[in-house]
């Protein structure tokens, strides 16, 4: 069954660290200028852009997202600011602005809609197809990926992108299952099989044993690391002198890339020696924010 793109109720996402994002862009030296422009490189449901447009009455934002469901939701949420928001169907790795901007923000997390909507195939909490594509136009989904890769390459992928120590055992089990039954019936079927690779005591911990493998498959399907590396190279070129770039990451691979880029890029001044993390109140209200890390840099 195809998800109805017009049903905005399906997109219910809490943007993380919104207050901290607002504080970060306040560091732009010309923040009081009446010609502020920004790029929200991961528009999602429009949560961060909404707060920015609300706070800065003269701000104009270019919002990027390759997920049509996200763009539709953002269009509805940001209706009152329609004269100041331009929504572009683009991945941040493939974008080139016409003019330089005052600041760039990016939230690298998977949005709640993608997780909670079983038809997107990101989660094992509710059964759905093994899809995991943020952009439904991508050719390869998660089912294609596990069928195409050989056992060694699949194990390497799960270890590299999921930091999963049982990657070889999991890969062996997946390829054996595919050989015996043809394919998995859905996300729960795959998650159950992965859980069976763990000792009984580890199957019922707070974090589901399939979490790391699902993360690895999602990253690979969407080429997230390649896209982030490209974005980190491009984004400083989008900024005006003194411009701010603020990036929220959610796992160690992303955070390491952002940290090293901000420290090593001669174009940038790193403004966060250590990442900023959510406060206790936000974590209490939105448990998915607990792993978020915000890093900020400024164009020299």
Swiss-Prot record:
Gene: rsmH
Catalytic reaction annotation: cytidine(1402) in 16S rRNA + S-adenosyl-L-methionine = N(4)-methylcytidine(1402) in 16S rRNA + S-adenosyl-L-homocysteine + H(+)
Protein family according to the UniProt entry: Belongs to the methyltransferase superfamily. RsmH family.
Major subcellular site: cytoplasm
HAMAP family: 16SrRNA_methyltr_H
Residue positions binding S-adenosyl-L-methionine: 46-48, 65, 92, 107, 114
Protein name: Ribosomal RNA small subunit methyltransferase H
Coiled coil: none
Locations listed in the record: Cytoplasm
Source organism of the structure: Prochlorococcus marinus subsp. pastoris (strain CCMP1986 / NIES-2087 / MED4)
């Amino acid at each position: 069954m195809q998800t109805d793109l017009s049903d905005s109720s399906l997109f219910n996402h809490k943007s993380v660290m919104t207050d901290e994002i607002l504080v970060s862009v306040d560091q732009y030296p010309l923040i009081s200028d009446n010609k502020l422009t920004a790029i929200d490189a991961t528009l999602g449901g429009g949560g961060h852009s909404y707060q920015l447009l609300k706070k800065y009455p003269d701000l104009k934002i270019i919002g990027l997202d390759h997920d049509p469901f996200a763009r539709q939701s953002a269009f509805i949420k940001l209706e009152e600011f329609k004269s100041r928001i331009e929504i572009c169907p683009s991945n941040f790795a493939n974008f080139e602005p016409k003019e330089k901007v005052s600041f760039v923000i990016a939230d690298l997390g998977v949005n709640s809609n993608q997780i909670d909507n079983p038809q997107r195939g990101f989660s094992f909490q509710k059964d759905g197809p093994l899809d995991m594509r943020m952009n439904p136009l991508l050719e390869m989904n998660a089912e294609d990926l596990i069928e195409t890769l050989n056992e060694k390459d699949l194990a390497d992928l799960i270890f590299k992108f999921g930091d999963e120590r049982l990657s070889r055992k999991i890969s062996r089990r997946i390829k054996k299952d595919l050989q015996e039954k043809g394919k998995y019936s859905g996300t729960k079927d795959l998650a159950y099989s992965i859980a069976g690779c763990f000792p009984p005591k580890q199957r019922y911990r707070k974090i589901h044993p399939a979490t790391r493998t699902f993360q690895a498959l999602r990253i690979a399907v969407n080429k997230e690391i390649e896209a982030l590396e490209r974005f980190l190279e491009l984004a400083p070129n989008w900024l005006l002198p003194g411009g701010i770039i603020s990036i929220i990451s959610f796992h160690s691979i992303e955070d390491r890339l952002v940290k090293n880029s901000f420290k090593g890029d001669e174009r940038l001044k790193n403004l966060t020696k250590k990442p900023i993390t959510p406060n206790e109140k936000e974590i209490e209200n939105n448990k998915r924010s607990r792993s978020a890390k915000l890093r900020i840099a400024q164009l020299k």
